[in-house]
Curated annotation (Swiss-Prot):
GO terms for molecular function: RNA binding; zinc ion binding. This is mRNA 3'-end-processing protein YTH1. Its main location: nucleus. A zinc finger (C3H1-type) spans 37-64, 73-100, 101-129, 130-157, 159-182. The lineage of its organism: Eukaryota, Fungi, Dikarya, Ascomycota, Pezizomycotina. GO terms for biological process: mRNA processing. Residues 179-255 are annotated as: Disordered. It holds the Pfam family zf-CCCH_2. InterPro entries: CPSF4/Yth1, Znf_CCCH, Znf_CCCH_sf. Belongs to the CPSF4/YTH1 family. Component of the cleavage factor I (CF I) involved in pre-mRNA 3'-end processing. The keyword Repeat applies. It comes from the Eukaryota.
Length: 255
């Protein structure tokens, strides 16, 4: 029989790293639990309060989430020292010691702007904006007049042949396909361009407000600067009504 060829997707998802053994590996394993299986059982003695084996315990020492202090969501970030193999905290590290893209937090830059300057090398999750769109109720019933120009998502589903014939004995528990429901009070479908125009108008209005506030601030700064300069006057610092003479003496008009 021909040997099964592993697909690239399986090689990525089911990747097994090559294990290396060094002279200091036993020390790291006993002191920091480095290299131990993350799926090993949890130590019940440690959870009850004290484990006599300490760091030499072959089981996991996991603190109770109810008694441990909150980490502020840091356990969803990958430990940068662990990526380089230099983390000394081991299982007690508040960061994630696992490189799993499904557990990465969402990239805020990609979410706001629709692109990321780091591209495929970004360590955070890039979610397609199309996946956030709600499903089109007209398409779910069987037909959307706007077709691919609809602003909502068109999800293809297999229809139940028994439901199309008039009756499905399994009802809502049917596994043969979807049961489209008819409704007469649906909102009119909208085009993609209309939603884009509304979004562009909102962005333009916000930009105009920022420009207006910037201009007002510039005018206030200019008025304040002119008021300070006018208060001291031009010549002599007294509105031009006198002259300074030698040795600090001041001679006003008429003297």
């Amino acid at each position: 029989m021909p040997s099964a060829v592993e697909s690239p997707a399986d090689a990525i998802l089911n990747h097994s790293a090559t294990s290396y053994n060094f002279r200091f590996s036993p020390f790291l394993r006993q002191t920091y639990q480095v290299g131990l299986s993350p799926d090993r059982p949890v130590c019940k003695a440690f959870q009850s309060g004290h484990c006599p084996n300490g760091t030499r315990c072959p089981e996991r020492h996991v603190s109770d989430s109810k008694t441990s202090q909150p980490t502020g969501g840091l356990n969803s970030l990958v430990c940068k020292h662990w990526l380089r193999g230099l983390c000394k905290k081991g299982e007690h590290c508040e960061f994630l010691h696992e490189y799993n893209l499904r557990k990465m937090p969402e990239c805020n830059f990609f979410m706001r702007n629709g692109y990321c300057s780091n591209g495929d090398e970004c360590l955070y999750l890039h979610i397609d904006p199309q996946s956030r769109l709600p499903p089109c109720p007209h398409y779910d019933m069987g037909f959307c007049p706007l077709g691919p120009n609809c602003s909502k998502k068109h999800v293809r589903r297999k229809l139940c042949v028994f439901y199309l014939a008039g009756f499905c004995p399994d009802g809502p528990d049917c596994k043969e396909g979807a049961h489209p429901k008819w409704s007469k009070d649906l909102e009119k479908p909208t085009l993609k361009s209309e939603e884009k125009k509304d979004e562009e108008m909102r962005v333009e209005f916000s930009q105009d407000d920022m420009d207006r506030q910037r201009d007002q601030q510039r005018d206030r700064d200019r008025d304040d600067g002119g008021r300070h300069r006018g208060g001291h006057g031009g010549h002599g610092g007294h509105g031009g009504r006198g002259k300074w003479r030698g040795r600090g003496r001041y001679r006003a008009r008429g003297h």
